Amino acid sequence: MKFFIDTADIEEIRAANELKILDGVTTNPTLIAKTGKPFMDVVKEILAEVPDKPVSLEVASTDYEGMIREGEMLAQLGKNVVIKIPMTIDGLKAVKYFEYNGIKTNVTLIFSPAQALLAMKAGASYISPFVGRLDDISHTGMELISQIKTIIDNYGFSSQIIVASIRNPMHVLEAALIGAHISTIPYKVIAQLVKHPLTDLGIERFLKDWESVPEKPF
């Protein structure tokens, strides 16, 4: 499974990149707004940090012409830019346009297997089903991931699943067990994946025992 980080915070991206496990970045208007910085400043910082990894940048328009205009502008910022497009009728048309012209797309805000199927039929490079938001309304987000994976296995679609709206380490583990291609993870959840209470206890015990070793070389 590939690990993307879901943030526009350059410090979080750098920290994740230093772990040598980062495979890409996803952003959205909300995450960029949280930085309090101008849009282009944020984007250029991110692209400079991960020039060889896919970075999803979302269009702000909801109409076809606007999506094309904004997507083409964003695509010029780097070869690793992926145009993030909402799951709408106009969005599907835009996906077809971009993919035909060699620009990768990520269809976002997917909440049903039917939406995922349409996005894959349109040729999306990536599809982003939101598990946490489904869990919030008493649906089972991971069931959606399993259904999408089955559709891909049945028909051989090339689209990759980006499990989005991840809230906790279990979401990542469940996505991996299902066979999703990618999880896009907030930095705080990446940090949580590292930790286990028995690991902490083991380190504490080893350090205590080490103190009793005579003539330590270091």
From Swiss-Prot:
It is an enzyme of class 2 (transferase). The keyword Transmembrane does not apply. The active site is at 84 (schiff-base intermediate with substrate). GO terms for cellular component: cytoplasm. Keywords: Cytoplasm, Pentose shunt, Schiff base, Transferase. One of its GO terms (biological process) is pentose-phosphate shunt. Its EC number is 2.2.1.2. Pathway: Carbohydrate degradation; pentose phosphate pathway; D-glyceraldehyde 3-phosphate and beta-D-fructose 6-phosphate from D-ribose 5-phosphate and D-xylulose 5-phosphate (non-oxidative stage): step 2/3. InterPro entries: Aldolase_TIM, TAL/FSA, Transaldolase_3B, Transaldolase_3B/F6P_aldolase, Transaldolase_AS, TSA/FSA_arc/bac. It is found in: Cytoplasm. Pfam families: TAL_FSA. NCBIfam families: fsa_talC_mipB (TIGR00875). Belongs to the transaldolase family. Type 3B subfamily. This is Probable transaldolase. It comes from Persephonella marina (strain DSM 14350 / EX-H1).
